[in-house]
Amino acid sequence: MENQKILVAKYAIDRYIKSNMNLGIGTGTTVYHAIKYLSEKLKSGNLKNLKFYTTSSDTKYLLSKEQIPYESNFSKLNKNLDIAIDGADEILLEKKSLIKGMGGAHLMEKVIAYNSETLLIIADETKIVKKLGTKMPIPIEVAPNAVGFIMTRLEEMNLDITLRICNEKKGPIITDNNNYILDVKMHVENPEGTEKYFKLFPGILEIGIFNHKNTKIVYYQNKQIKEA
């Protein structure tokens, strides 16, 4: 699958990324390959004057490793970014709806994505599903003081909920924004309606369902690169 990720990352960048763009950079293994290829194109001079806006501490680290400067201050932005490049955990092609957030960065990923003219998703064939929630739970970022209230409310809806726990230390995962993540197992019949509904719960800061109005998907399937 790593080779598929490399192929789609290179294809998407060659096709859609131009010099002088303001780019949002997502989080995850596929984005890692995009950063590596962007670094090559910047060093060769094939791309110039790109500004990068990051979604996580992990992305900042990867950009720094490639000696690519990034913008830390978003407060001066007064217009949308040109393109946000990101991966996905599940993709429903017919609606261009996504699940994101298994890397714990979906709050800032959505801030960057929904404030970009285009959300450019790159993915291998394992990410394509016929219904969201088939393989992955839905990540929900929650304010720590609200987690008990939210878990009770979701349990009353007969949903299967898990507080995401760290593997390397005891206790829950803390996001870059100092919040908790709940993973909710459910099949999503209506992605747009589900996204809007859960955002109404006080204490839920963001849900990992994405329905960007202008999503382009570059993916690998049946031994070829496809677009949706």
Swiss-Prot record:
<protein>
    <recommendedName>
        <fullName>Ribose-5-phosphate isomerase A</fullName>
        <ecNumber>5.3.1.6</ecNumber>
    </recommendedName>
</protein>
<feature type="binding site">
    <location>
        <begin position="27"/>
        <end position="30"/>
    </location>
    <ligand>
        <name>substrate</name>
    </ligand>
</feature>
<dbReference type="Pfam" id="PF06026">
    <property type="entry name" value="Rib_5-P_isom_A"/>
</dbReference>
<dbReference type="GO" id="GO:0006014">
    <property type="term" value="P:D-ribose metabolic process"/>
</dbReference>
<dbReference type="InterPro" id="IPR020672">
    <property type="entry name" value="Ribose5P_isomerase_typA_subgr"/>
</dbReference>
<dbReference type="GO" id="GO:0005829">
    <property type="term" value="C:cytosol"/>
</dbReference>
<feature type="active site" description="Proton acceptor">
    <location>
        <position position="109"/>
    </location>
</feature>
<feature type="binding site">
    <location>
        <begin position="86"/>
        <end position="89"/>
    </location>
    <ligand>
        <name>substrate</name>
    </ligand>
</feature>
<keyword id="KW-0413">Isomerase</keyword>
<dbReference type="GO" id="GO:0009052">
    <property type="term" value="P:pentose-phosphate shunt, non-oxidative branch"/>
</dbReference>
<comment type="subunit">
    <text>Homodimer.</text>
</comment>
<dbReference type="InterPro" id="IPR037171">
    <property type="entry name" value="NagB/RpiA_transferase-like"/>
</dbReference>
<dbReference type="GO" id="GO:0004751">
    <property type="term" value="F:ribose-5-phosphate isomerase activity"/>
</dbReference>
<comment type="pathway">
    <text>Carbohydrate degradation; pentose phosphate pathway; D-ribose 5-phosphate from D-ribulose 5-phosphate (non-oxidative stage): step 1/1.</text>
</comment>
<feature type="binding site">
    <location>
        <position position="127"/>
    </location>
    <ligand>
        <name>substrate</name>
    </ligand>
</feature>
<dbReference type="InterPro" id="IPR004788">
    <property type="entry name" value="Ribose5P_isomerase_type_A"/>
</dbReference>
<feature type="binding site">
    <location>
        <begin position="100"/>
        <end position="103"/>
    </location>
    <ligand>
        <name>substrate</name>
    </ligand>
</feature>
<comment type="similarity">
    <text>Belongs to the ribose 5-phosphate isomerase family.</text>
</comment>
<comment type="function">
    <text>Catalyzes the reversible conversion of ribose-5-phosphate to ribulose 5-phosphate.</text>
</comment>
